[in-house]
Amino acid sequence: MDNNSVDSLIPIIITGPSGVGKGTLIDKLRKEYEGSFGHIVSHTTRKPREGEINGVHYHFTDIPTMTEGIKNGDFIEHANVHGNFYGTSKKALKDVSDKNKICILDIDVQGCESVKKANIPCKFIFISPPTFETLQERLIGRGTENEETLKKRLETAKKEMVYRDIPGFFDHVIVNNVLDVAYGELKSIISPFISFQSKSNK
């Protein structure tokens, strides 16, 4: 796929195992290109972590409410991760698109499968750790997981990294070993979208 060929602001989906640095990379993009991205706020049934704000980091909801929304077809993708539901609503996608902003989604591999099945054109990017052991060290170092949740996240990470090696499943794979190097790779993929969006707003 030609990185320089962009003729529409299709959503950009960034995925990868928990702890790989997806959020950090997205935050850097949003700071450098302030105003270009309309980061979509996903829904989740998990409890907020310290410092997380409802409507900013996630729309925090409960299982009955989210289950009803899924049944009604309100979500373009949803997944059950570590016993909690996550999902992206159609309304959130439309809100960003209507403002001529670039949609950037941080979703898991299950969510990617749902989007692919729905035939929604997207740019799929996988952020990979250099090794599984590195990821394990990062998760332990984060200090936010107990033994049970750490085990679950590592089991999920192993499954997700299998998808990384499926030919054609992702448009790009970026190894996040050195953050600035990984960010440089991500910028080179995203820059045609930034250029297209800037021209569209003129």
Swiss-Prot record:
Q: Does the keyword Transcription regulation apply?
A: no
Q: Which family does it belong to?
A: Belongs to the guanylate kinase family.
What the entry lists under InterPro entries is as follows: GK/Ca_channel_bsu, Guanylate_kin-like_dom, Guanylate_kinase, Guanylate_kinase_CS, P-loop_NTPase
Q: Which cellular component appears as one GO term in the record?
A: cytosol
Q: Name one GO biological process term.
A: purine nucleotide metabolic process
Q: Name one GO molecular function term.
A: guanylate kinase activity
State the gene name recorded for this protein.
Answer: guk1
Reaction(s) catalysed by this chain, per the record, are:
GMP + ATP = GDP + ADP
The record, for Gene3D superfamilies, names:
P-loop containing nucleotide triphosphate hydrolases
Per its UniProt record, what Pfam families does this chain match? Guanylate_kin
Question: For this protein, what is the EC number?
Answer: 2.7.4.8
**UniProt-listed SMART domains:** GuKc
According to the entry, every stretch annotated as the Guanylate kinase-like domain falls at: 9-191
What name goes with this protein?
A: Guanylate kinase
Per UniProt, where does ATP bind?
Answer: G16, P17, S18, G19, V20, G21, K22, G23
Keywords annotated in UniProt: ATP-binding, Kinase, Nucleotide-binding, Transferase
Protein species of origin = Dictyostelium discoideum (Social amoeba)
Q: Report the superkingdom from the record.
A: Eukaryota
Q: Where are the membrane-spanning stretches?
A: none
Q: What is the lineage of its organism?
A: Eukaryota, Amoebozoa, Evosea, Eumycetozoa, Dictyostelia
Group of enzyme by EC: transferase
Q: Which SUPFAM superfamilies match?
A: P-loop containing nucleoside triphosphate hydrolases
Biological role: Essential for recycling GMP and indirectly, cGMP.
